[in-house]
Design a protein with these regions (language model features):
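Ubiquitin-like/PB1-type beta-grasp interaction modules and other compact soluble beta-rich domains
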Residues: 1-64
Length: 65
């Protein structure tokens, strides 16, 4: 199925979850914010299955000062 991740179309397996997508990009769940179809996904909902045409934004937190 096809989804849009940070503005780019990507093909992912059917039934992939938010958690699996985070793992696919080797991201640490505690260091990212995920938006699915313009709604923030709380970490306890990362087992939500993605659907064809979904739009995902991944924001990575970085420290600095």
């Amino acid at each position: 199925m096809n989804v849009k991740v940070n503005g780019d179309f990507r093909e992912i397996p059917d039934g992939e979850t938010v958690r699996a997508l985070v793992a696919r990009y080797n991201l640490k769940p505690e260091k990212v914010a995920i938006e699915l179809n313009r709604r923030l996904v709380r970490s306890e909902k990362y087992d939500t299955a993605l659907n064809d045409g979904d739009e995902i934004e991944i924001v990575t937190f970085v420290g600095g000062g």
